[in-house]
A protein has these predicted regions:
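Non-catalytic accessory segments of hydrolases
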Residues: 20-184, 208, 468-481, 489-499, ...
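Serine-hydrolase-like catalytic core of hydrolytic proteins
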Residues: 91-275, 291, 305-340, 492
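Extracytoplasmic/secreted proteins, especially bacterial periplasmic and envelope-associated proteins
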Residues: 189-192, 196, 222, 258-265, ...
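Acidic/polar loop patches that form or flank catalytic/metal-binding clefts of enzymes
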Residues: 273-276, 288-289, 405-411, 491-501
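Substrate-gating cap/lid region and adjacent catalytic-acid/histidine neighborhood
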Residues: 285-472
Length: 542
């Protein structure tokens, strides 16, 4: 490890006194571009570096360009506060950030490390946040890296550009880029962060050859993307995906010409068809016009640079990063009413199935049966969840186990969170909570674990998410899932002492092993893959 410098002995007495009061004192390390100063948390025994820049601010003429290398700095750069999050609206009101404000100048990362002087070779976890590529940031409490660091892991969270700033494509942008493509700037930011990790993580005690990337929802989609991209070859040693893959119908990349047309049409609609006009706008002007358009972001792009083809095509060709994969989804990603748009009655359910699958509705009704109102609720929940995100995640799992010769571990998170500690709150769309609207339609009780609800369990952060009345059972589930994840980051295998055995999925198994994560976690044979095989054909990914 490059020298991690605790401040000079002459001032140690001062800092020791301060540490007794504040539980921290300054600590420095030298990275590629200069010296940074974070804090040493004396209570937790961790070094914390927040708001570390990993690329030039993508502002001015760097708006809508691939991230550019940092210039070196002189002196000591303070890195004790989370950097600003990417520009975004309140898309998911339940997201809670600890960062200070919003800015196009958002390319910062955060590091938690247990390293002592001359520590070397620690495994590394790089976590990408979710939020549909339109919201989120690396400072959310549920992504906090302290628990992982206390397990002997260097934990990193990364900010990346979002919405119009991160994924806008346009013919003029493609023309000016050396690689003749545009869009995907948020994914390129992530890639730049991974390259930064390769250069600098040894300064924090980490081993650049032991980097596992992870994420949930759009963060999981990002993990798929990085595995598929030729730009990330050699940068990762393992991957964890929680509910999401960049495979149709879930935020899959589109052809460059289609993305350019989408961007050009948007630019015309706001009376700024040229790149010069778009770059001349202030951050606020541009974002307000984007927000007024009611667009939910912009698509990722097969730009010939980051993405060279679709994810299924890449994996089938064996061109992906062939690394161990731990991947899964939750038992009730979204409510069944997202599909039925009405009551769980036989008449309504069958009608909706026929509308969605006019040629194959009989097969769908066998796969998602409707023998009673309760069975309809369960089937509608399964179908809604599969169409939303479970199928695409399954497809990723299936591709990697068949075309990588690497171990692939599949899970199903089934723990339903306990009641909220505050009755004035209600669960939000992105895993957190929002104020309850007394006039809102009352949703049925959840029949399984909702989208994003596993994050604080797997990261060991229940104690930081205090909206719920966590029980001993919740902490038991968290300990199990957290240890599986930590073991995987360390070794590429989730198994360890005092944990139920988790077999890797066999390449050709029709009923591959699945770890059901709940109060009593256990591995079982998959019983629902016929659903995914049907959807594979329906979406044309087979």
């Amino acid at each position: 490890m490059k020298k991690i410098k605790l401040l000079l002995a002459a001032v140690c007495t001062f800092f020791a006194a301060a540490a007794q009061t504040n539980n921290s004192f300054p600590v420095q390390t030298k990275i590629d571009n200069g010296i940074i100063e974070g804090n040493y948390d004396t209570k937790e025994g961790l070094q914390l570096y927040f708001g570390v820049p990993f690329a030039k601010p993508p502002v001015g003429n760097l708006r809508w360009k691939a991230p550019q290398p940092l210039d070196n700095w002189k002196g000591v750069l303070p890195t004790k506060k989370f950097g600003p999050r990417a520009v975004q609206g309140i898309v998911f009101g339940d997201m809670k950030s600890r960062s200070e404000g919003l800015s196009e100048d958002c390319l910062y990362l955060n590091v938690w490390t247990p390293a002592k002087h001359d520590t070397k070779g620690l495994p590394v976890l790089v976590y990408f946040y979710g939020g549909g590529f339109v919201a989120g940031d690396g400072a959310e409490p549920r992504y906090d890296g302290a628990a992982m660091a206390k397990k002997g892991i260097v934990a990193v969270t990364v900010n990346y550009r979002l919405n119009i700033f991160g994924f806008f494509a346009h013919p003029e942008l493609s023309k000016e880029a050396a690689y003749k493509g545009s869009g995907n700037y948020g994914l390129l930011d992530q890639n730049a962060a991974l390259k930064w990790v390769q250069k600098n993580i040894a300064a924090f005690g980490g081993d650049p050859s032991k980097v596992t990337i992870a994420g949930e929802s759009a963060g999981s989609i990002s993990v798929t993307a990085q595995m598929a991209s030729p730009l990330s070859k050699g940068l990762i040693a393992g991957a964890i995906g929680e509910s999401g893959a960049s495979i149709n119908p879930t935020l899959a990349p589109v052809p460059l010409a289609e993305a350019e047309k989408t961007g050009f049409d948007f630019a015309k609609s706001i009376n700024a068809p040229t790149l010069a006009q778009l770059r001349a706008m202030t951050t606020q002007e541009l974002y307000e016009l984007y927000n007024a358009s009611k667009r939910f972001g912009f698509p990722t792009v097969i730009d010939g640079y980051f993405y060279t083809k679709t994810v299924p095509e890449t994996f089938k060709a064996g061109e992906q990063s062939k690394v161990p994969l731990l991947v899964g989804w939750n038992s009730a990603e979204i409510p069944g009413m997202a599909f039925t748009q009405g009551p769980f009655t036989d008449e309504n359910y069958v009608k909706k199935v026929k509308e969605a699958y006019p040629k194959d509705f009989e097969e769908v009704l066998k796969l998602y049966p409707h023998g009673s109102d309760k069975e309809i609720e369960l089937s509608a929940t399964a179908l809604a969840s599969d169409r939303f995100i479970a199928y695409s995640t399954w497809k990723w799992f299936d591709l990697q186990r068949k075309y990588s010769n690497q171990p692939v571990y599949r899970y199903m998170f089934s723990r339903v969170r306990p009641p909220l500690a505050d009755n004035s709150l209600t669960p939000g769309l992105a895993g957190g909570t929002v104020k309850k609207d007394p006039n809102a339609f009352k949703m049925p009780e959840p029949v399984g674990a909702a989208h994003a609800s596993e994050i604080e369990y797997c990261m060991g952060n229940l104690y930081l998410v205090n909206d719920y009345a966590w029980t001993d059972d919740d902490y038991k589930v968290s300990e199990t899932m957290f240890n599986y994840f930590a073991n995987f980051v360390k070794t590429g295998n989730p198994n360890g002492k005092d944990l139920p055995n988790w077999p890797a999925a066999l390449k050709d198994a029709t009923d591959p092993d699945v770890m059901i994560i709940n109060v009593e976690s256990k591995a079982v044979k998959a019983t629902d893959d016929a659903r995914y095989i049907f959807l594979d054909k329906a979406y044309g990914n087979n």
